């Protein structure tokens, strides 16, 4: 009898707990459809099942909001304005959204879990963003750790981007071995030295990342990217390698790749001010796009200089392109500084970090650096050093343009 009573009591407790969980779920989780009103326009508004992130909901409706980090909450790009619904702003959003913006309803779409009807506002240019399945034309090393990925846009399609813009690229779930990468012999020494071929990239879900374009608008029918492989830091080799760069480095001619865009804010100002471009590493991409656009498409007569930092001569690329531009345009000069030139380089040019070279060989004796426009893209340490140098010279924020994606 006692055993039967014990079993009955235990069963009763379990049933009560199950009922409590179901009750809580019914109150806390909205499982029905919700309505999302977009810009007060019925044609843009939609209904969708509740419970997903707003960024994903918009994407499923063909509305592609920029998200360089792929929805991780770290880039702060997927801003929307929520007029109704959405709940309270989350701590993860406050590093990107100030109090004034939060009061106006600004939110990060990747952080908003949709549980109720929403009224949102989006910039009109977002509705010009599209998605394409492209074909890989080529994927070649331009430096030891940088590939140039060239994609063919589908016939009859056009990506209406501006110089300095970027696209988002999708990496599917994958299991990629670095041993399968196509790395030319001239670059394999460093790969072997750091034992990089031992790595694998194993990912179980689709990932999205942003890359600045290296081509300019008159180079039609293609998208060209400069992609640096993101390997684990030497002191922490157990950190997983970069998801997207691993995927891109594995691509071969003929492969299909999904992109969306165009996006961007790193655009040239329409003024007559002198333009000074500063780049390093894969930050070459938007530099090339801007400079080619200014000189080849716009036929700009503005004074333009380009200062690029590389480790050694083997890490330099597009030299012939920029040499030709310099020969054809008297208003353009470009300069390279090597931080670690090798004996075989026989280098007689500038050495050291590019911000120091720029300061000592140009800006220190410039009559008015504060009147110039500075466009930069490179590794974080380079960007920080350049910005500090410019601030010390009295350059205002409005004349310092930074692309955080290309480096």
Curated annotation (Swiss-Prot):
[2Fe-2S] cluster binds at residues 69, 75, 78, 110. GO terms for molecular function: 2 iron, 2 sulfur cluster binding; electron transfer activity; metal ion binding; oxidoreductase activity, acting on NAD(P)H, quinone or similar compound as acceptor. It is a single-pass membrane protein. Residues 129-269 form the FAD-binding FR-type domain. It catalyses: a ubiquinone + n Na(+)(in) + NADH + H(+) = a ubiquinol + n Na(+)(out) + NAD(+). The keyword Endoplasmic reticulum does not apply. Its main location: membrane. GO terms for biological process: sodium ion transport. NCBIfam families: nqrF. HAMAP family: NqrF. This is Na(+)-translocating NADH-quinone reductase subunit F. It comes from Serratia proteamaculans (strain 568). The lineage of its organism: Bacteria, Pseudomonadati, Pseudomonadota, Gammaproteobacteria, Enterobacterales.
